């Protein structure tokens, strides 16, 4: 891809936008960056662009800048419906995402992992397995470092593992992973997409450019995933914790069994540090992605056994008076809360926050069967109570700290208190990490 002397516009100056601008400038492009924030708000980002001849267009998006560019690179947080992007698209300007730009230069085999939930855990495990097997590996994408930073560093690698969001897939054209994984599908980001269907279609683009030489790792237990996997050009490689597979990877009686091209490997799950049924799926997906690209079973099993839960994903906080407390602040949608509820019994569930637009009714069965007490907080509390409040003992709390105190009073020894919000955090907190820290502090103060 020739960039020298091309007029390239980078839209959005978060971490990804800054990395793209630096890379493009290093390749001789005439780069302009645009962001609706002002210079004071962007001081840190702008300092990273100093001395590179990059033009700035702040507090506005000029239509002429968009339509007169040769190429536009869009940051993930920028919606497709931005009027200036629509105008540029109609004018025939090539518009791509950062992952599309990076993939045009990456030479190593690329593993791309998406899904509504579990992406970060599965991506991190996959990267760790490659490293344990001796491959020089870059792990990034929607977590950690943008893919484009690998190119800017010019560090030689043998494997690339990327967590990919639906936002990043919106502007791909030739993005083609050697292995693409779709972990699951459930309602999310309906504040961004016009419909659930539109969200699903964005996710499915991860397979769009694959051929029969590539692999599609898919969840055989997810009806939506399997429905949309029919007709994929890539070689289908399913994983399941519910059914035995002739070709794929599945769980049976304490073993993960891998079957591929007549070969079988067995991985005992005893001793795994990572707990929860959803994490069993993440582990199988990670093993599939890595074993399909030449990792060895012994080293891979050793890596999986040692892996511990990432922060804010069903993380154990403490045990007090016979009650175990867990923090799952990253569970910002219904699908992730379903997986958490499947992992415990006798639960006091703390949920709520900023409503993202989906229905909470898919939680009904698990709330009825497993949740003894439901404590609701935040903007979504009213609607959650309407949909779930008749299924179990339900209370409201004005603050997270009040919710923790109430949960401590309600939960009998042998029970579990789980904060798994099913909502984003922005009504009460800066982000999900601040929500987690406040919860942990309140629990430890009991």
From Swiss-Prot:
Q: Which Pfam families match?
A: Mur_ligase_C, Mur_ligase_M, MurD-like_N
SUPFAM superfamilies per the UniProt record, alphabetical: MurCD N-terminal domain, MurD-like peptide ligases, catalytic domain, MurD-like peptide ligases, peptide-binding domain
Gene Ontology biological-process annotations: cell division; cell wall organization; peptidoglycan biosynthetic process; regulation of cell shape
Indicate which residues the UniProt annotation says bind ATP: 115-121
Pathway where this protein functions: Cell wall biogenesis; peptidoglycan biosynthesis
Recorded catalytic reaction(s): these are: UDP-N-acetyl-alpha-D-muramoyl-L-alanine + D-glutamate + ATP = UDP-N-acetyl-alpha-D-muramoyl-L-alanyl-D-glutamate + ADP + phosphate + H(+)
Q: Extract one GO molecular function annotation from the record.
A: UDP-N-acetylmuramoylalanine-D-glutamate ligase activity
Q: What EC number(s) are associated with this protein in UniProt?
A: 6.3.2.9
Family annotation (InterPro entries): Mur-like_cat_sf, Mur_ligase_C, Mur_ligase_C_dom_sf, Mur_ligase_cen, MurD
Determine if ATP-binding is one of this entry's keywords: yes
| EC primary class | ligase
Record's GO cellular component terms:
cytoplasm
Q: Which compartment or compartments is the protein found in?
A: Cytoplasm
Q: Does the keyword Cell wall biogenesis/degradation apply?
A: yes
Q: Which UniProt keywords apply?
A: ATP-binding, Cell cycle, Cell division, Cell shape, Cell wall biogenesis/degradation, Cytoplasm, Ligase, Nucleotide-binding, Peptidoglycan synthesis
- What is its biological role? Cell wall formation. Catalyzes the addition of glutamate to the nucleotide precursor UDP-N-acetylmuramoyl-L-alanine (UMA).
Family indicated by similarity = Belongs to the MurCDEF family.
Q: Which NCBIfam families match?
A: murD
Name the UniProt record assigns to this protein? UDP-N-acetylmuramoylalanine--D-glutamate ligase
Record organism:
Pelobacter propionicus (strain DSM 2379 / NBRC 103807 / OttBd1)
């Amino acid at each position: 891809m020739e960039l020298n002397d091309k007029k390239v516009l980078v839209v959005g100056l978060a971490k990804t936008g800054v990395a793209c601008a630096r890379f493009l400038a290093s390749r001789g492009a005439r780069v302009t960056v645009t962001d609706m924030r002002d210079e004071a708000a962007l001081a840190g980002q702008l300092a990273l662009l100093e001395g590179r001849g990059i033009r700035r267009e702040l507090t506005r998006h000029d239509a002429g800048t968009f339509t007169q560019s040769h190429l536009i690179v869009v940051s993930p947080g920028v919606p497709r419906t931005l009027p200036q992007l629509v105008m540029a698209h109609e004018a025939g300007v090539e518009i791509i995402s950062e992952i599309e730009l990076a993939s045009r230069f990456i030479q190593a085999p690329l593993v791309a992992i998406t899904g509504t939930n579990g992406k970060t855990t599965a991506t991190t495990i996959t990267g760790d397995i490659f490293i344990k097997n001796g491959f020089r590996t870059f792990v990034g994408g929607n977590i950690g470092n943008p893919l484009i930073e690998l190119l800017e560093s010019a560090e030689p690698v043998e494997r690339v593992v990327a967590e990919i969001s639906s936002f990043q897939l919106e502007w791909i054209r030739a993005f083609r992973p050697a292995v693409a994984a779709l972990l699951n599908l459930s309602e999310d980001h309906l504040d961004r997409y016009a419909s659930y269907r539109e969200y699903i279609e964005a996710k499915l683009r991860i397979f769009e450019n694959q051929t029969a030489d590539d692999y599609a790792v898919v969840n055989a237990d997810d009806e939506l995933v399997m429905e949309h996997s029919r007709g994929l050009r890539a070689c289908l490689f399913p994983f399941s914790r519910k059914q035995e597979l002739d070709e794929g990877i599945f769980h049976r009686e304490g073993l993960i069994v891998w079957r591929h091209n007549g070969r079988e490997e067995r991985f005992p799950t005893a001793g795994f540090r990572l707990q929860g049924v959803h994490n069993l799926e993440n582990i199988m997906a990670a093993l599939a992605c890595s074993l399909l690209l030449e990792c060895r079973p012994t080293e891979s099993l050793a890596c999986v056994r040692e892996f511990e839960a990432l922060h804010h994903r069903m993380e154990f906080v403490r045990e007090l008076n016979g009650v175990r407390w867990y923090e799952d602040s990253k569970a910002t949608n219904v699908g992730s809360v379903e997986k958490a509820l499947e992992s415990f019994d006798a639960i006091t569930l703390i949920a709520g926050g900023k409503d993202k637009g989906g229905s909470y009714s898919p939680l009904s069965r698990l709330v009825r069967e497993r949740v003894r007490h439901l404590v609701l907080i935040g903007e979504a509390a009213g609607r959650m109570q309407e949909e779930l409040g008749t299924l179990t003992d339900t209370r409201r709390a004005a603050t997270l700290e009040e919710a923790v105190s109430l949960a401590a009073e309600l939960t009998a020894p042998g029970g579990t208190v789980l904060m798994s919000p099913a909502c984003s955090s922005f009504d009460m907190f800066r982000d999900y990490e601040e929500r987690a820290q406040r919860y942990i502090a309140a629990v430890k103060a009991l």
